[in-house]
């Protein structure tokens, strides 16, 4: 079993890794002034909300794993033509 920190850095476990890194970098670059990083936080929050909805739907349908793998997520996003968040 992976530790929580390692799981959060794993692309298969964390669908919003890119958004996580962007918001962290913004905070580092702006000396932790949250107001300057609000757009990054909103994008991260919307990303989590979107993939949580996908996960709930898959769980309801009995699809395993509940969270799509990184490869599956790539295909889902490509089929949408633009990022939903």
Swiss-Prot record:
Originating organism: Xenopus tropicalis (Western clawed frog)
A single Gene Ontology CC term: mitochondrial intermembrane space
Classification via PROSITE patterns: CHCH
Motif Cx9C motif 2, residue numbers: 37-47
UniProt domain CHCH: residue ranges: 13-55
Cystine crosslinks: 16-47, 26-37
Motif Cx9C motif 1, residue range(s) on this chain: 16-26
Name under which the protein is recorded: Coiled-coil-helix-coiled-coil-helix domain-containing protein 7
Subcellular location: Mitochondrion intermembrane space
Family per record: Belongs to the CHCHD7 family.
Gene: chchd7
This protein's UniProt keywords: Disulfide bond, Mitochondrion
Keyword Nucleus listed: no
């Amino acid at each position: 079993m992976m530790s929580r920190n390692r799981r959060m850095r794993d692309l298969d476990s964390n669908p919003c890794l890119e958004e996580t890194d962007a918001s962290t970098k913004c905070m580092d670059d702006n000396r932790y002034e949250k107001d300057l990083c609000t757009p990054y936080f909103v994008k991260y929050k919307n990303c989590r909300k979107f993939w949580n909805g996908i996960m709930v739907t898959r769980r309801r349908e009995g699809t395993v794993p509940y969270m799509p793998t990184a490869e599956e997520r790539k295909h889902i996003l490509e089929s949408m033509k633009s990022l939903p968040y």
